[in-house]
């Protein structure tokens, strides 16, 4: 069976390459906006859909010939996908890309080995040739490169290399190495073995520093050089928080996937929960959704089970010893006291035990 996996690296282009990369960012944005504009105009005039090609724009815009043609073709595909997602009610109507606000990126495809790693320190790309690469994680030889996305984040350049590979995943035989995880606002999760993730809460740790930077930004003249410099500082701190969170979650999900043969969690509506309970910052800080995605694909590649149980299952209200279900349990009550069997147990630990038990029933372990 075929699978896809992306590898992200930092690259170090020279001045000429950096100039061409930034020129490609601009050309891709220009092509996207032009195709979107003509599509909107044609629909208003005729009531029909029409997506023009990047090739039709090159005669009047000679600068488009200087950059990677596949990057321009992918911009056209992005317009098509934007309309498809809109008509299928998965996204809002496509918007034009701003030079200042939009993410600077472009995607190019591998054709006839046009994209490859050389000497474990260079990445060969169309038009750009050899770029210095921080090759900290090796791509297996049986993985075929499909495409590369270049991005600029706070002045640093990165590539995300999408690969395709074939793998026959051997399912791990059933045994008792099952763990249940109950979502915790402050600690990420509490497990059925009464382990706590002890998530460092990076955003909360640096929130005061962010406030100071944002306060300083508010005092500067908008769109001035100093305003942009201050905005860059804020952006870099946000990126640092994001990278710390991602690193922590990768290591934690790897440890769990290697230790257990099945992981059971609740299928929670995190976005709705954060809006309803005004816990947006705390929910966003711990990255629960990102953690589950990491855990799912790592378990899958190892032939292990990842199970989401119904979000309406009363894991917190149910007694893990006798099965009694409470009519009501306030969020402020941090321990579970059962009226039937008399057990008193940590609320989150009790919920994790229930999640594990229902998961074992479903998986027939």
Regions found by a protein language model. Give the residues of each.
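Nucleic-acid substrate recognition interfaces
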Residues: 1-365
